[in-house]
Amino acid sequence: FNRQPSLHRMSMMVHEIRVMPGKTFRFNLADCTPYNADFDGDEMNLHVIQSEEARAEAKILMRVQEHIITPRYGGSVIGGIHDHISGAYLLTHGDRFLPKKLVMEVLGAVGWDGELPESIERDGVTGYLGTDILSLIVPTGFNLDYTSRSGDNVIVKDGKVTGTIDKRGIGAEDGRLL
């Protein structure tokens, strides 16, 4: 995809194709920031790469995954927006308790096959803390300490998250966890 004017290398990036119903081209909402696309009638151009050689080169140099960090200021330009941030906030704010049945359904739906944190029991229901579930996707050995916009001290020690994750944690252009 490309959105003009092409002012920087992130104005044109390679996306993986998945055929879906409908007559419009779609891409993940989190990928809009580098294109400066805001859905007010923005025009995007789709370029189809013709040769195997060109496809290989584009995958190496132009994939979205290669442009998460902006060269302008070294921060993440692609990150959580809207529902991602709200979900992370609701999952980690306070002492969020999730019943084991719900956790199993969600982790099963995404194909999780790793180990689970230690379960706890509240009011006769077995479950997990929201921060423990979020910690499943944070790499072991990752450490971080910052204050969230809501004023909570967020500490990630060896991949274990404590505190409230908000835009400062996973937001585009602001995400400390990214």
What is the predicted function of each stretch?
Residues 1-16:
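Long, charge-dense accessory insertions within large macromolecular proteins
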Residues 15-178:
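Feature marking long nucleic-acid-engaging regions of large polymerase/nuclease enzymes
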